[in-house]
C-alpha cells in the first residue's frame, strides 16, 4: 500500500496538487497509538511532533485533504481497528476533507466505520480544527471476493483525489486494475531512481 501511496502522491504533485497528503500506514498507526496510549500528552509528546505538524498543516490550510489506507479487522460483520493481537484482514480508505468538513469513508464491503476510528479522528481533529466533521460515504467498487480490498481501497482513494486519471474500476476489472497499479508503481520507481542516479 505504501508504494502505491508514494506513486499516487507523486501523481498529485505532477498535477500541481500540493494540498493533499496521503499518510503512510505507519503514520496512521502512530496516530492510533497516541490515541490509545498517550492521548493526554499528545501536545507535548516528542515522538508525536511530526503528527502535530500534519495537524497544524490542516489548521493553516497547507493541506485541505489528508487521506489514509487503514487496516481493519472484520469479525462477525463488525469492523474494528487492527492491533498487534488482532492484525487487519481488510483495507478501507479514509479522507479528511477540510473544504467540506467531512470524513469520507470507503469500505468495499459497505460496513460502517469502526467506532474507535470515529473517536480517534474526532480526538485528533479536535486538537487542530474547530468545526465538526461529518461522516460521508466515499465511492468505492463493491467487493465480491476475499482478496480484492487493497486494490479497491487504493483505487477509491485515487478516484477521490484524481478522478480523471483514476475512474472507479468495475468489479470485473480487478485483475486489470492490479496490472495498472503495478505499472504505475514501476514507472514511479524507475523515474525516481533514475533521477537519483543523475
Model-derived features: where do they sit?
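Enzymes acting in ubiquitin/UBL processing and closely related pathways
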Residues: 1-16, 84-198
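Cysteine protease catalytic domains with a Cys-His-Asp triad
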Residues: 1-92, 96-102
Amino acid at each position: 500500500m505504501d508504494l502505491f501511496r508514494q506513486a499516487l502522491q507523486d501523481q498529485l504533485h505532477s498535477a500541481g496538487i500540493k494540498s493533499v497528503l496521503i499518510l503512510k500506514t505507519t503514520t496512521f498507526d502512530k496516530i492510533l497509538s497516541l490515541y490509545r496510549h498517550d492521548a493526554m500528552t499528545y501536545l507535548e509528546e516528542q515522538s508525536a511532533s511530526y503528527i502535530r505538524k500534519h495537524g497544524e498543516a490542516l489548521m493553516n490550510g497547507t493541506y485541505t485533504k489528508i487521506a489514509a489506507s487503514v487496516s481493519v479487522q472484520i469479525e462477525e460483520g463488525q469492523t474494528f481497528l487492527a492491533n498487534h493481537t488482532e492484525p487487519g484482514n481488510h483495507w478501507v480508505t479514509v479522507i479528511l476533507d477540510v473544504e467540506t468538513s467531512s470524513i469520507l469513508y470507503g469500505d468495499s464491503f459497505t460496513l460502517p466505520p469502526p467506532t474507535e476510528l470515529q473517536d480517534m479522528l474526532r480526538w485528533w481533529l479536535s486538537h487542530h480544527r474547530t468545526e465538526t466533521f461529518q461522516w460521508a460515504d466515499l465511492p468505492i467498487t463493491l467487493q465480491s471476493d476475499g482478496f480484492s480490498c487493497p486494490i479497491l481501497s487504493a483505487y477509491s482513494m485515487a478516484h477521490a483525489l484524481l478522478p480523471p486519471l483514476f475512474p472507479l474500476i468495475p468489479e470485473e476489472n480487478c485483475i486489470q486494475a492490479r496490472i495498472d497499479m503495478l505499472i504505475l508503481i514501476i514507472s514511479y520507481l524507475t523515474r525516481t531512481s533514475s533521477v537519483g542516479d543523475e
